[in-house]
């Protein structure tokens, strides 16, 4: 039995009329269209030298001196900001004129592969068709059709395949066929070196998956799409694309330590994230800054959960040049399944989501596990970070207060120059900048001692956040003396 997708109300988008079904096939109830995705934002770049670490044997016993070796990490490049929608016709059903405009590599040559995945009652998930024909799509048949998707009518999925990122649209249509056991399930997706512009093709993929359900085997629109958008990337010599073009992914805008991420669709993504987790956002914020491995579990639909992955990444933005080059990149994996276990075993930091409950038992693969609104960790050293302190509640109060002021100005004054996404991203970026700016100034001062006054000025609790600060100093390689009085001592 197919159930209607239970997306949160704040994540319902513009309705897209379903394509007309063939007379012999019943029309599915596909619900609202999922016309949305991740907007563009820059990704991490090497920004300069980090703060040098040293420890002094002459420091008193009440001082925590933190030392950490430096390691260089780099990540995939990004793209320029997306432009506004423009009216007009387009060659591909579902692509706007804006989507087809060519203004440089960031606007063209994005698509590494186009594919159709189907569920076969005898063979399971399988690649039905793809371009180019020799591209390595091993595992994509499971990434683009999440486990448990047979219970919903439609979904969309962001995922990672090697150094590429994918977006697939899934649909489930009832059919009068014993061979297909009453349901036809397919996904149509694309791969790209960057995930920042994948959302542009969401509408096209939705229309194409409906087309494939009604007219299986008709790939002409997908072939034309690929020829128009195909990437020109270096070859590994065997006809397979194996490397991302670093020159093509060169910085276009100013970079931060972590991507300055901005979502423009769907409206309400950040609002839903805040309402869903409430004060626990402050717990997630600390884990994100500490570059922990965060895994989010949820049953399908998984598209909404991919946005939670995105929102978690937004918590770790820092715009101070040179800060964070010694820490692992906080990598969004988006949707993962059991086939990704070997890749996760070598990851130092990531945030991902899954529909497979078995991951909860694989404790060696994650540091933080989120099931619904339940945030937990099996690591004893991280247990104290699950407890909210007064500074956490004060920050959350300020965030909610700023949201209310923004909503009031939008409703009363008609001020639409800012939105909740901007507010959310800037709120945490400013908080992070304040912390690292203070730590940097103390580290290079004549007396590199971090006092309770410094900690309060950073918006942290001198007692409740002491363990968090110790971990932060170690991970980011900042050499300061942390001196905080013990409340139990006179």
Swiss-Prot record:
Function according to Swiss-Prot or TrEMBL: Probable guanine nucleotide exchange factor (GEF). May promote the exchange of GDP to GTP, converting inactive GDP-bound small GTPases into their active GTP-bound form.
Any one GO cellular component localisation term in the record: cytoplasm
Start and end residues of each dDENN domain: 399-490
Domain cDENN: start-end pairs: 249-397
Name of protein: DENN domain-containing protein 11
Signal peptide (residue range): none
The organism's place on the tree of life at top rank: Eukaryota
InterPro entries per UniProt: DENND11/AVL9_GEFs, LCHN/Anr2, Tripartite_DENN
Record keyword Glycoprotein present: no
Domain uDENN: residue ranges: 19-221
Keyword set, alphabetical order: Guanine-nucleotide releasing factor
Molecular-function GO terms, alphabetical: guanyl-nucleotide exchange factor activity
Bias kind Polar residues: ranges: 30-43, 52-61
Region (Disordered): 1-86
Sequence similarity: Belongs to the DENND11 family.
């Amino acid at each position: 039995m197919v159930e209607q997708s239970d997306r949160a109300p704040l994540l319902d988008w513009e309705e897209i009329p379903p394509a007309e079904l063939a007379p012999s096939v019943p029309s599915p109830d596909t619900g609202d269209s999922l016309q949305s995705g991740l907007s563009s934002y820059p990704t991490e770049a090497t920004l300069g030298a980090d703060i040098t670490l040293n420890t002094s044997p002459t420091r008193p016993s009440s001082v925590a001196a933190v030392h950490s070796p430096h390691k260089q990490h780099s990540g995939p490049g990004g793209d320029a900001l997306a432009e506004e929608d423009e009216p007009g016709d387009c060659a591909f059903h579902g692509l706007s004129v804006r989507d087809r405009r060519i203004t440089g590599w960031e606007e063209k040559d994005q698509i590494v592969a186009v594919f159709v995945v189907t569920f076969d009652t005898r063979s399971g998930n399988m690649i039905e068709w793809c371009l180019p024909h020799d591209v390595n799509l091993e595992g994509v048949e499971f990434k683009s059709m999440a486990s448990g998707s047979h219970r919903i009518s439609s979904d969309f999925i962001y995922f990672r395949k090697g150094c590429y990122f994918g977006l697939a649209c899934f649909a489930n249509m009832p059919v009068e066929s014993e061979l297909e056991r009453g349901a036809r399930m397919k996904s149509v997706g694309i791969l790209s070196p960057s995930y920042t512009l994948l959302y542009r093709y969401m509408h096209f993929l939705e229309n194409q998956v409906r087309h494939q359900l009604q007219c299986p085997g008709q790939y002409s629109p997908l072939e034309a799409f690929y020829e128009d958008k195909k990437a020109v990337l270096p070859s590994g010599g065997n006809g397979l694309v194996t490397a991302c073009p670093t020159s093509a992914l060169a910085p276009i805008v100013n970079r931060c330590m972590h991507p300055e991420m901005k979502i423009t669709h769907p409206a309400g993504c950040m609002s839903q994230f805040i309402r869903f987790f409430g004060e626990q956002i402050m717990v997630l914020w600390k884990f994100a800054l500490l570059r922990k491995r965060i895994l989010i579990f949820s049953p399908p639909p998984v598209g909404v959960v991919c946005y939670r992955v995105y929102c978690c990444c937004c918590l770790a933005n820092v715009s101070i040049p040179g800060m964070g080059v010694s820490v692992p990149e906080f990598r969004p994996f988006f949707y993962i399944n059991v086939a990704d276990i070997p890749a996760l075993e070598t990851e130092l930091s990531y945030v991902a989501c899954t529909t497979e409950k078995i991951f909860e038992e694989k404790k060696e693969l994650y540091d933080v596990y989120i099931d619904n609104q339940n945030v937990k960790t099996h690591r004893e050293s991280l247990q104290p970070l699950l407890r909210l302190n007064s500074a956490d509640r004060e920050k959350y109060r300020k965030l909610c207060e700023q949201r209310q002021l923004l909503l009031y100005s939008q409703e009363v004054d008609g001020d639409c120059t800012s939105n909740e996404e901007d507010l959310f991203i800037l709120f945490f970026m400013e908080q992070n900048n304040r912390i690292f700016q203070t730590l940097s100034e103390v580290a290079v001062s004549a007396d590199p001692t971090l006092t309770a006054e410094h900690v309060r000025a950073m918006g942290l609790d001198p007692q409740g956040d002491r363990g968090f600060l110790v971990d932060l100093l170690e991970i980011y390689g900042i050499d300061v003396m942390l001196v905080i009085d013990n409340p139990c001592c006179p």
